[in-house]
C-alpha cells in the first residue's frame, strides 16, 4: 500500500478541480435564446411565406422566430423560448431537414406542417403571450427549422433555420 501524506493528497485534489470543471462544462448544453414575435393581432397575417428551398422574402412577415445563436455544435442544445407577442399564442417546434432543398410536408386544409412526416425533434407547446418555456434536445449535425405550427403561422413566415455543426 502506498502512503501519501495528507498535504500531498490535498494538493492533488485541488489540482484536479479545474479538470472536473472542464469535463462538466464540455458536456453542458449549448443555450439558444428564441423569441416568438408578431406585429400584433390587428395586422393582416401574411401568407405564402413558408420555408422554400429556393428562398423566400421574410421581410413581409407579420410574425417570426429569432434564435441566437443560429448555430450550435452537435450534442445537447437547450432552447429558451419566449413568446414576445402581446396577444397571440405561439409555439416552437424543432424540425430536422433531411433534405434542405425540399419544403416541409404542408397540410393546406389545416394550415400547418405535418409534424410526424416532417421530423419533429421536440417542442415548446403553445405559450400564452409573455410566457416562456425550455426544451433540451440532442441534435446531430445538419440543418433544422424552428417553426410555429399554430394554424396559419408557419405560412405567415414564422420559422427560422438553425444549423448544427460537428
Residue ranges and their predicted role:
Residues 30-31, 66-96, 134-147:
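Beta-strand cores of secreted/periplasmic/IMS beta-sandwich domains, seen most often
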Residues 4-5, 24-27:
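Serine/threonine-biased, Pro/acidic-interspersed low-complexity stretches characteristic
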Residues 17-25:
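C-terminal segment of classical bacterial N-terminal signal peptides
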Residues 2-12:
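Bacterial N-terminal signal peptides that target proteins for export
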Residues 29-76:
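N-terminal edge beta-strand
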Residues 90-126:
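The feature marks short-to-medium sequence segments in extracytoplasmic or secretory-pathway proteins
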Residues 32-33, 38-40, 86-87, 119-166:
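Extracellular/periplasmic metallocenter environments
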Residues 15-18, 144:
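N-terminal secretory/membrane targeting signals
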Amino acid at each position: 500500500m502506498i502512503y501519501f501524506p495528507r498535504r500531498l493528497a490535498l494538493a492533488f485534489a485541488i489540482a484536479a478541480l479545474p479538470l472536473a470543471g472542464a469535463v462538466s462544462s464540455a458536456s453542458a448544453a449549448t443555450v439558444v435564446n428564441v423569441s416568438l414575435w408578431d406585429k400584433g393581432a390587428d395586422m393582416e397575417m401574411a401568407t405564402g411565406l413558408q420555408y422554400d428551398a429556393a428562398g423566400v422574402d421574410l421581410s413581409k412577415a407579420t410574425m417570426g422566430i429569432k434564435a441566437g445563436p443560429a448555430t450550435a455544435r452537435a450534442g445537447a442544445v437547450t432552447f429558451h423560448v419566449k413568446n414576445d407577442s402581446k396577444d397571440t399564442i405561439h409555439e416552437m417546434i424543432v424540425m430536422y431537414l433531411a433534405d434542405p432543398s425540399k419544403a416541409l410536408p404542408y397540410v393546406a386544409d389545416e394550415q400547418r406542417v405535418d409534424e410526424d412526416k416532417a421530423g419533429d425533434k421536440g417542442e415548446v407547446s403553445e405559450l400564452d403571450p409573455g410566457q416562456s418555456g425550455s426544451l433540451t434536445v440532442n441534435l446531430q449535425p445538419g440543418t433544422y427549422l424552428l417553426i410555429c405550427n399554430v394554424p396559419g403561422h408557419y405560412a405567415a413566415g414564422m420559422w427560422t433555420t438553425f444549423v448544427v455543426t460537428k
